[in-house]
């Protein structure tokens, strides 16, 4: 059994990032951050270069470092309203419907770990037609990605130890969180920083099927 197969054969649960991994929300994410940048006199291209992965508060603090707690909360709340209103064009990522259908068919526990607030996570997943049995959102943790708290909580909710859980991510903060939690790190997309590397969720599903078929 090859190394990726050996890794995946040990998995008994799957936790997936939302934006960029399970859901293609790129257009909506960029539109809302572009508008925020313009509202605050910032270069949209500079903001867009770093906004994928971190939670909204982290991005706001990065560009408005002297901001107080009340003003930060106002920015985050306004941004959340804009994000929840702008879900046009949010679609499932390539292979997402097929992967979650296979996980459900196999009765393999799975869920979503996201730096988005729960309200936004439900809106985007709903727009993409994906019903996640477990959602760990930014509202559930004290520290978002790259902190491992979300993945540790997700594994606990699924009832599977992190070492036997695949953490599927596309961004550097997410990959760092999945790794720090002790999960099997699956990098999807352009990143190569994973125990298993897949072009998309179609490929991940094929690898999971092959790994399951090779079990004794």
What label would you give each PLM region?
Residues 4-106, 117-122:
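N-terminal helical cap/lid subdomain that shapes the substrate entry/recognition surface
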Residues 1-12, 97, 101-104, 108, ...:
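Asp-based, Mg2+/Mn2+-dependent phosphohydrolase catalytic module
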Residues 24, 112-114, 187:
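Hydrophobic residues in well-ordered beta-strands that form the structural core
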Residues 92, 113, 143:
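Residue-level marker of regulatory loop/turn positions in helix-turn-helix DNA-binding domains and
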């Amino acid at each position: 059994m090859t190394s990726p197969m050996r890794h995946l054969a040990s998995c008994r649960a799957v936790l997936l990032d939302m934006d960029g991994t399970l859901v293609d929300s790129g257009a909506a994410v960029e539109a809302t951050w572009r508008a925020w940048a313009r509202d605050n006199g910032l270069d949209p291209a500079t903001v867009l270069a770093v906004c994928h992965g971190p939670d909204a508060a982290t991005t706001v603090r990065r560009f408005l470092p002297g901001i107080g707690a009340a003003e930060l909360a106002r920015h985050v709340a306004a941004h959340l309203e804009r994000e929840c209103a702008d879900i046009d064009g949010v679609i499932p990522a390539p292979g997402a419907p097929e992967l979650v259908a296979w996980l459900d068919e196999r009765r393999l526990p799975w869920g979503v770990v996201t730096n988005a607030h729960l309200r936004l996570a439900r809106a985007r997943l709903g727009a993409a037609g994906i019903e996640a049995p477990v959602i760990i959102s930014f509202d559930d943790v004290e520290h978002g990605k790259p902190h491992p708290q979300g993945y540790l909580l997700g594994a606990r909710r699924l009832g599977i130890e992190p070492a036997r859980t695949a953490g599927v991510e596309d961004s550097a903060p997410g990959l760092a969180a999945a790794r720090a939690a002790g999960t099997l790190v699956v990098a999807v997309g352009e990143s190569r920083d994973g125990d298993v590397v897949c072009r998309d969720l179609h490929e991940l599903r094929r690898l999971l099927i092959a790994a399951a078929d090779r079990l004794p």
